[in-house]
Amino acid sequence: MAAAAMAGAADPPHLTEAKKLEYFSSINSMARKIMQEREKIKETYGSAWSQMSPVEQDTAIDNGMMDPRIRARYAMHRVDRDEVICYPKLLIQTGQKIVHFGEEDLTWQDEHSAPFSWETKSQMDFSISNMTELFVPPSVNEPKPKTSQTTKPPSNDESSFWKISAERSRLDNEKAEFPSLTPSQIKSLEKGEKPLPSYLRLESGSRDMEEVPVSRPAKQRAPKPPAPPPPPPVPISMTPAAISVTPTPPAPVPSLEEGWERAQSTLPSVSSTTDEVFSPGLVTRSSSQSNSTVKDVEKAEASPASSPTFSQFNTSSSILKTGFDFLDNW
């Protein structure tokens, strides 16, 4: 830029004026007209223009662009005015129209009536200087109002909350005995009880954890008694519809499920009822044969029922599911 400035200073004056004319004329049409008027004024002064000072050149341009009669008219109406500190405000009285509504005696004043204004009367009368008068700061000598009359006494919940917060902050400073409060601890603090230290709470928690596994075996399900050995096989002679029941000998180590299946296999009433339902020979059977069959079945049932250990099994067709047997056979 320094080189360009030096090159511009080295150019002759007529080249500099030509560049100025070209630049300002290329801005817009108004600038081009102004530059043309300026060139006409320069031509009227001729060679004396280059000898004039910049102030004299500006005065000559102003006098050439504005008619002297117009300048004299403005000079006649020139009045010395006081300087206005703030922006001048148009003092008009708007909203002077009174509106009457129909036949009823309803009247109101139209705030936006003639003379019209976008602002209402209250908006036009508003001033910031009035606000400073309204908000006068109180003097230092004035006594302060009593806070006891204006302040509301804190409720019990708020007071307890602040007590708990103060207690917690104090304990946090003292190595933070409890990092977090549970609802039960908050209730105990509200009642005035002191919470247990952290090491005591840890021990009590560990004791509870130790007590839980000890008490669990007592709650476990009682083991089912082993299945009793089946009675010796008793041959039963029945009609073709009846079937002789011969229970299988027990295994060396009988399990609970095998004992239950074995006990059900020794129930002759179930097998007899099944045959009675599905055998076609029962349709022509006489009542005497049925009575003798029932007596034989009752004798067979009486022999296993005599043992005390076998009495826990139900020999009826509807097996009662009680206790843990219900869970095993669900």
From Swiss-Prot:
Residues 236-246 have a biased composition (Low complexity). Residues 136-160, 172-314 are annotated as: Disordered. Transmembrane segments: none annotated. Pfam families: DUF4706. Residues 263-276, 284-294, 304-314 have a biased composition (Polar residues). Residues 223-235 have a biased composition (Pro residues). InterPro entries: DUF4706 (IPR031600). This is Uncharacterized protein C1orf198 homolog. It comes from Danio rerio.
